[in-house]
Amino acid sequence: MAPAATAAASSGKGSFDLATLFVADKAARDEAGLALADAVKKSGVEFFTQIGFNDAIVKALNDKKSQSAREGACEVISTLCENGAAQLLEPHVISSAENTPFPALLEAFADKVAAVKTAAIAAVKAIVQSMNPWASFVLLPALLNLIRTSGKWQIKAGSLEILQQLITSAPFQMGEAMPDLVPVLAEAVWDTKSDVKKAAKATLEKAVSLVENKDIEKFVPALVKSLLNPIEEVPKTISLLSATTFVSEVTAPTISLIAPLLIRGLDERPTATKRKVCVIADNMSKLVDSEYTVRPFLPQLLPRLIKTSETIADPEARSVANRAIVTLRRIGKVPAESDGSDLPPLPVAEGPHLATNFVALVKKHGGVSVEQTNPGLAYAGVLAASLVNHHNFDQKTWESTLPPYLKLALPSYDSLPAVRELLQKKADEAETDDAKFPDEEEGEDLCNIEQFNLAYGAKILLHHANMRLKRGHRYGLCGRNGSGKSTLMNAIINNQVEGFPPPTEVRTFYVQHDIDGSEAEISILDWVLGDKRLLATPDEIKSTLESVGFDEVKQKNSIGSLSGGWKMKLALARAILFKADILLLDEPTNHLDVLNVDWLINYLTSLTRCTSIIVSHDSDFLNRTVTDVLHLNNFKLKRYPGNLEDFVQHVPEAKSYYQLDVAEDYQFKLPNPPLLDGVKTKEKSLLKMRNVSFQYPGSSIQQLYDISLQVSLSSRVAILGPNGSGKSTLVKLLTGETEPNLGGQVWKHPNLVIGYVAQHAFHHIDNHLDSTPLEYMLWRYQTGEDLEEMHKANRVMTEAEIAKMKEGATVIKDGVKRIIDELVARKKLKQSYEYEVSFKGMSSAENIWISRDELVARGFEKKVMELDTREAQRLGLMRPLVRREIEKHFEDFGLDAEFVSHNSMRGLSGGQKVKVVLGAATWRRPHIICLDEPTNYLDRESLAALIAALKNFEGGVLIITHNREFSESICTEVWAMREGYLEASGHNWVEGQGSGERIDKKAADDDEVEYDALGNPIVKAKKEKKLSAADKRKAKKDRMARRKRGEEVFSDEEL
């Protein structure tokens, strides 16, 4: 051997006697190994090639006659790794070259000499401990193949030991490789050799420790059991997991453990088990960050789900399966015509190709010419391929991984520009979210945070996200309802975002109309002067207030007199005075009319030193305002340059932020109202206002002048007008929130139910934020009535009304004076009603009936209305106030049962809270739905669903909105309010029933569909109409006439 080695050494530029590494004397071998380490550190990475190192090591490992040669070959690897030459050795040992010694080292695990076997395992461990972690993917296929197929148990056991070392040395990379690891280890646990079985079990336990998902941490032992003993453990584990709420991101280690369980579970026979699997698959898939995470399991999981949806009998379980299929297709980007089993293989980057790219880029950036076969450069190509194939395009990772190996080939060259350009190229090719835009480095940074996390309670909102904000930019923060937009802004203002600059460095202001009810009587000027955060003099404050529309007179008005639009302008005035570096605006156009929205756009676009982060569902406002879009999706925050239109070019599926398209799988459904006594067409008026005028107590200006109008079931009314024109006041008078105080009358049908959502929609739930929507509904409707109705002005008795009622409570009956106690019941009386009245101190047998007009004349109008409301709800066939029915009702508004029954309303997003308010307002099946600014906080998808639901609603609709797109898509009638006067157009007001279609007679084909126990519709046989006696006589006469003519005719009795 020595002559061959010497010849190899002398033929190259380097010189080293390799034979000394394989002599019998161990001390001499060790000395030679140290000498080689010194020599290679001086001469560089190509020294190994020059002396023929790989060929000599492979030859020595295969020398069955010389134990010292085999042992020496293993020892020199360990010596080089332990003495500072590991990085120089890596490109030669870990490569795709045919003469790499790695396979021979693995075969040495089965050497008959124990010392050689021990040295071989130690050598491979030394390589694994010192190598770059991204090289793990190069070694792993060989290890897994030997564990699965080797006929020698020693090699299997040794490979499992190395696998354990890999898990320790490169945990992140091994976590990514879990889809490949788990099946091999689960099989190896059943090996016939106890040593292999024991090693496999230990390795599997170590591998599952890589699962960091807090949702399933406690279930990991059960999941491992189900892998090892599927027949008995799978049903139990599925039951355990089905009760789990997934809130943490689902990564490769997590899905590697759960997917085999789901695949096996779908092969079980019980429908309940299959349904639970579908629920788990759906919930889990929603939290998968990338298609590549779920891709390995699609060929087995998706076809089984499709088969389940086609064969399962229970319709509800079928719908759950279909939901899981839709989610899995979306996450895995599987075409509609594919079942996931025929997906094309993912593109694979090759090390030599990337090494060629490096050669060209080095030359482009002024480097010297270098051969792509250079070990350092070729190995950098291998590592770059490993990064690309595992979709890691993080700049820091590339800059820390590749330059050290490029430096081996080009010691004096700065390789960072070449690495960055290749990273950008590969990221663009992969269409990854990590791709950077050309303007990324332009402008002054206000904040540059990398790898931060954000959670709300147990729910993960952002995971390893980056956020970079430039001075003077206007960022539109986009994402679905519930994705965490408002939570992120609250976290910024409350200093809860790790790495965000403190207030002493960057002044941040949250624009919101946060006016406390206790401050309603304070003047506008005093309220602003009282804000100690504002760095402004009283004169500056006054001039700023004037600049946004608050003249001297208006500054003296109380805050409580401001409409929603003026409150938002006041909040913006405070933001101007705060002199902020960053403005946070959450739905700033809420309650603003068109003119004020234009003013806001002009103001924001004029700011050159102030940065804005804007959350808004007004697509036109965003399109005209923002310079960049921050997209909050899949736990990441990605910046896209340009406005909303440009953003849609980059992310086509985000069109839902820009267009009002109703999604098939996301629709709202409003409950249709019951019939009303005496109402035979949709044109008949149910609510009338005649010559009503109104002025708020304490206000110097009258709000409404001589208003007359009416509302019917066919009404589709848009109430339009500038801020402060009296729109909300008008609606409050119609719904009974307030009462006319300057003359006029408001009349409504005694059984009419109105569903009302106020301008500040959240005021309905403000006192119940720590309750779940379920608990709120149980409280609000606990008596069968709407408890919110009890606080309306038309239900609260004034002192004058109490005095009048007390005076009119005396009834003379049979010469005896009686005092009215309560109104007990009601019944029809011609065109009106009469009411059963009980008397104080008398039994129910003494009750009498009094007409409505008489009771109203006696001052009992509000008591009459109270009884009318109870009767209206009873006639509305109120559904049972139970959990299942409430969950089903909210489901019609896109709110999952999970949020209804298990999440407090404080933790819900703005959009989800609006859905709660909408659901609560429509629980009583209202005849008229009145919505004051309903588009606030709803995303475009929810807005489209609401529009479609209102179009299909069988009752009347009143809408106050500044969103023209919303109003024009629903309303045919316009009530234009201008300085307290009403101009109505497009209406169809009639006296009496009108000429519309009759609604009081049920059509013959309107019978309700009945369902069997599984929910499938029952097709009923039509009942034959029974003949009357006259019909029978007529039929008999007809038969006799036909017989007389010679025809052969028989009756049923004769047959």
Swiss-Prot record:
It is an enzyme of class 3 (hydrolase). It catalyses: ATP + H2O = ADP + phosphate + H(+). Residues 1024-1055 are annotated as: Disordered. InterPro entries: AAA+_ATPase (IPR003593), ABC_transporter-like_ATP-bd (IPR003439), ABC_transporter-like_CS (IPR017871), ABCF_EF3_subfamily (IPR050611), ARM-like (IPR011989), ARM-type_fold (IPR016024), Chromo/chromo_shadow_dom (IPR000953), eEF3_ABC2_chromodomain-like (IPR015688). Its EC number is 3.6.4.-. Residues 447-659, 687-1004 form the ABC transporter domain. Ribosome-dependent ATPase that functions in cytoplasmic translation elongation. Required for the ATP-dependent release of deacylated tRNA from the ribosomal E-site during protein biosynthesis. Stimulates the eEF1A-dependent binding of aminoacyl-tRNA to the ribosomal A-site, which has reduced affinity for tRNA as long as the E-site is occupied. Assists translation termination by stimulating the release of nascent protein from the ribosome by release factors. Appears to localize calcium-channel protein CCH1 to the plasma membrane. This is Elongation factor 3.
